[in-house]
Amino acid sequence: MNILGIDPGSRNLGYAIVELNNSHMKLIEAGLVKIKPSEFQYQLSQMIEGLDMVFSSHSVDEVAMEDIFYAYNPQTVLKLAQFRGALALRIIQLHGNFSAYTPLQVKKALTGKAKASKEQVAFMVKKILGIKKEVKPLDITDAMAVAITHAQRLRLKR
């Protein structure tokens, strides 16, 4: 089963496809859709086109997306919410449904602590998926973490 993990951001869209086979997880692909600075509607379009490319190049059985987090800047929260809404609509159109996890849920699922740092999460992602090299930027490891969180939830449901 292939799980697509998505980390939407205001500048980039991190994505990761993790294969879940019984209790074993394997990274299939991970990457970043870079959003070029431009007017907002063009940024939305870039993000959706990037998501479309991921769906067209891989078989996806489950989709999980990180929920937006609180930010001090209201404009940032608004922009992230609009990006997430556009992504949610496109995922529903292409796939039918998705699961959402808050950053705290993801951190707790991977490290056991809801207040874990991004570096602690990245360490656990690499350990779980058997990745030896450093993964940058953290948008990519966040997407991997979302996919792993969803895989763990699916295993618990069985």
UniProtKB/Swiss-Prot annotation:
Reactions mediated catalytically: Endonucleolytic cleavage at a junction such as a reciprocal single-stranded crossover between two homologous DNA duplexes (Holliday junction)
Enzyme class: hydrolase
Species: Nitratiruptor sp. (strain SB155-2)
Protein name per its UniProtKB record: Crossover junction endodeoxyribonuclease RuvC
Co-factor remark: Binds 2 Mg(2+) ion per subunit.
GO terms of biological process kind: DNA recombination; DNA repair
Domain of life: Bacteria
Gene3D superfamilies to which the protein is assigned, alphabetical: Ribonuclease H-like superfamily/Ribonuclease H (3.30.420.10)
Assembly: Homodimer which binds Holliday junction (HJ) DNA. The HJ becomes 2-fold symmetrical on binding to RuvC with unstacked arms; it has a different conformation from HJ DNA in complex with RuvA. In the full resolvosome a probable DNA-RuvA(4)-RuvB(12)-RuvC(2) complex forms which resolves the HJ.
Cofactor(s) needed by this chain: Mg(2+)
